[in-house]
A protein has these predicted regions:
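Short, small-residue-rich loop/turn micro-motifs
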Residues: 7-10, 45, 86
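Extended boundary segments
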Residues: 1-2, 114
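Polybasic, glycine- and aromatic-enriched phosphate-binding surface used to engage nucleic acids
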Residues: 13, 28-44, 50-51, 71-80, ...
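Long mid-to-C-terminal scaffolding/interaction modules that assemble large complexes
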Residues: 47, 53, 117-121
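Sequence-specific dsDNA recognition surfaces
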Residues: 2-37, 55, 60
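Glycine- and aromatic-enriched periplasmic loops at the membrane-periplasm interface
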Residues: 62-64
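Amphipathic alpha-helical coiled-coil/heptad-repeat segments
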Residues: 72-73, 77-80, 84-91, 95-100, ...
């Protein structure tokens, strides 16, 4: 199973390839931490404000906060919303030390506007084919490189 770390989050929309993978024993030891596809990963320590979507069941390290959208909430909306907030996330984590650190409590206090379900549904209908194409293109690029 892919194990997402901050280096895996640079320059991509989806985490298609990761540097590290978990063994069966590793997966079993943290089974409640498995992220479903289209969860949104946000880096909050070190290089704070990186945002990616999970392409397949994965787990991540503690430097990453993951958002699994509820039924009826577009993961693409959440992804794009977090992308627009990435500079704010980075600033909130700056405390005078050299390492940016936005803890889960601070992260959960970020206020956002969530449109109505009908707007989110229409947004999802428009964005879904685009994000499917992005994922397909990322996978194709990896196949071509290998």
């Amino acid at each position: 199973m892919p194990f997402i770390t901050i280096p895996d989050m640079h320059g991509c929309v989806y985490n298609v390839v990761t540097e590290k993978y978990l063994s069966i024993a590793g997966i079993a030891s943290q089974s409640k931490k498995t992220l479903p596809p289209n969860s949104v990963c946000v880096s909050c320590i070190g290089t704070a404000g990186l945002v990616t979507l999970v392409s397949e069941k994965s787990q991540s390290n503690q430097q990453i906060n993951a958002i699994t959208p509820k039924e009826g909430i577009s993961p693409y909306y959440v992804y794009l919303l977090m992308k627009t907030l990435s500079k704010i996330i980075n600033k909130l984590g700056q405390s005078g030390s050299t390492i940016v650190n936005l803890n889960k409590k601070q992260f959960s206090k970020i206020q956002v506007i969530i449109p109505s379900r009908s707007i989110l549904c229409n947004f999802d209908i428009l964005c879904n084919p685009l994000f499917e194409m992005i994922l397909s293109n990322q996978r194709e690029n990896i196949r071509l490189v290998n």
